[in-house]
């Protein structure tokens, strides 16, 4: 934190730990470490986003960075020309849609698959990939009265950041407009996850594309 560039790598983060998670899961490190002063949290999945992040870090003067990566091979969703900007969310779909999924890491693929399924049903949503928390975009979506679903494959660092930022800015938010899904229980209590495949764990936590569709359709 004293002008030193230190990047911490978390490999197989979130529920990507999968069947190796009998002893531990990388789901609570992010909400614990984000309490460190000046730490920048970045949670990525797309390989091109990863390259863009590494180029950003290599420029120097970034301080403490927690870079969280997936284990599985991931599909590219961004162009090679992507320029990473810390604190920026990337919107996929209609920005005027009344419902928005906010996610990060491998959750972006579940979000995009849910978006596709809902589009086939005649409903358009937006999906926001937030590898790092975008305070301005979150505030904008809230003030526009959007229905927001935080879908996080960890203990919920984006929603925690959201609560802090809305309080800091004095922006009122309605619990009726905000829904959260994470590795916490539905009562938002932290828990230990058992070992399982990614698919099994995503289903357990209600974070699969199918679960996101059902949550948006029946609960929002």
Listing of model-derived features with the role each one plays in the protein:
Residues 1-100:
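Conserved thiamine diphosphate
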Residues 17, 65, 70-220:
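Thiamine diphosphate
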């Amino acid at each position: 934190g004293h002008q030193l560039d230190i990047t911490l790598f978390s490999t197989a983060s979130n529920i990507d730990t999968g069947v190796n998670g009998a002893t531990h899961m990388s789901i609570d490190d992010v909400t614990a470490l984000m309490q460190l002063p000046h730490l920048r949290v970045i949670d990525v999945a797309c390989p091109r986003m990863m390259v863009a992040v590494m180029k950003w870090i290599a420029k120097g003067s970034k301080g403490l960075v927690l870079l969280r990566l997936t284990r599985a091979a991931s599909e590219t969703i961004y162009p090679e020309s992507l320029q990473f900007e810390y604190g920026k969310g990337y919107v996929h779909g209609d920005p005027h849609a009344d419902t928005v999924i906010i996610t990060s890491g491998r959750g972006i693929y579940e979000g995009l698959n849910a978006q596709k399924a809902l589009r086939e049903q005649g409903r358009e949503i937006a999906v926001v990939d937030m590898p790092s928390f975008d305070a301005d975009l979150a505030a904008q979506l809230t003030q526009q009265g959007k229905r927001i679903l935080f879908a996080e494959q960890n203990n919920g660092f984006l929603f925690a950041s959201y609560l802090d930022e809305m309080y800091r800015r004095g922006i009122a938010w309605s619990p009726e407009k905000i829904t959260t899904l994470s590795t916490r229980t539905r009562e938002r209590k932290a828990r230990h996850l058992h070992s399982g495949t990614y698919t099994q764990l995503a289903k357990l936590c209600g974070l699969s594309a199918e679960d996101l569709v059902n949550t948006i359709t029946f609960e929002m």
